Amino acid sequence: YLPNYHKLQEESISGYVSVSAYGGYSCNSEYEFLTGNTLGFLPSGSAVFTQYLNDKQNGLVSWLNELGYTTQAISPCSEGLWDIGNAYEQLQFKDRIYNCQDRMSDIQYFNGNITDETIFRYIEEQYERHAGSPYFVWTATMQNHAPYDHPEGVIHEITFEDYNNPAAQEYLNLISMARTWLYFQRRITQDFDRLLSLFGATRALKRRR
């Protein structure tokens, strides 16, 4: 499954990422990735975006700003979620778009959330707007967010044998639904050097037998 994802693995450098967040607190994964800082010295249960991000933070975004990049954060969520309105400002994104669906047409939803495909089409529009100049975009999508109990809306191309875990099956099929964007990424990276980083911060699935 995930043929486009595995094709990208063959054509590029791939690996695994370990994050402090487990089954939640995705804002902490964002913070650690974008700054290179660890949450290892903060109390358990901390949410750095809402509790500790009160000043400008140097990291990947500020470095790319210095190199002349347009740095853009795109979110389908409101500024209040994990206080990303303040967080993305402190992380020094030049351009910040919240509730991005307000700027889109032909919006599709799944499980009450805007679909990955809709977000990716919008990213493609932004990419084309910045063609010919250095561009960095950061987004966190919501299509594959928990709960994983809406099988009627999922195309079940991946099935399990002798393993009863409907939530895990739905989760994998949701990831499979995102493969359209991976095809798009393969297409836009053919003529220019591009760095694509993909990782997930997801709810832990209860083990079943």
How would you describe each model-predicted region?
Residues 1-209:
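Solvent-exposed soluble domains appended to multi-pass membrane proteins
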